[in-house]
Amino acid sequence: MPSKMTNFGKFAIVDSGVKIDVDLSRFNKQYQKAQYGLDGDVMTSMIPFMPMQSGIFVDVTRAASASVQGTGKVYAAYGPAGQFLYKGKVMVSSVTGSTWARLGEKKVLVSQYSGQTKAKEDLSYNKTAHPEAQAYWFDAAKTRDINKWVKNVKKNAGGGKRG
């Protein structure tokens, strides 16, 4: 469902004694539809590049994005594992250096850990479910699908006839 975002309204231009009333509010629905579609297209485009084992991470991220769809926000990575999965970096307990941390224990990047750890710096993604899985998957999706996104936005916003 599109958000209640207002892009344009009514305004007046006065120049040299001439007053022009302009009402662009009729475009709001088109732009809301375009934004809603773009947000959905971005999320859908990212999925093949996201790491997936059980599917929970992808599903949680998709649900979080769906909850804000139409606002111009898309979650590329949601939940506690999101940051390190998106950046492709291993995080360890700041206390023990283990990849497992106790409840409430802060996790840091391997490069920020002051002690010794056997953890590797970079994540290695399982590519069984998603062969194109990689870090920074929004960028990969954007590189592949930006032209499709623009075409759909133009179409939904009412300007798609000219390309």
PLM region spans:
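General secondary-structure edge motif
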Residues: 22-23, 129
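Charged, well-structured alpha/beta interaction segments
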Residues: 23-54
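Charged, low-complexity interaction tracts
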Residues: 2-13, 33, 47, 54-163
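Small-xxx-small helix-packing motif
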Residues: 13-16, 20
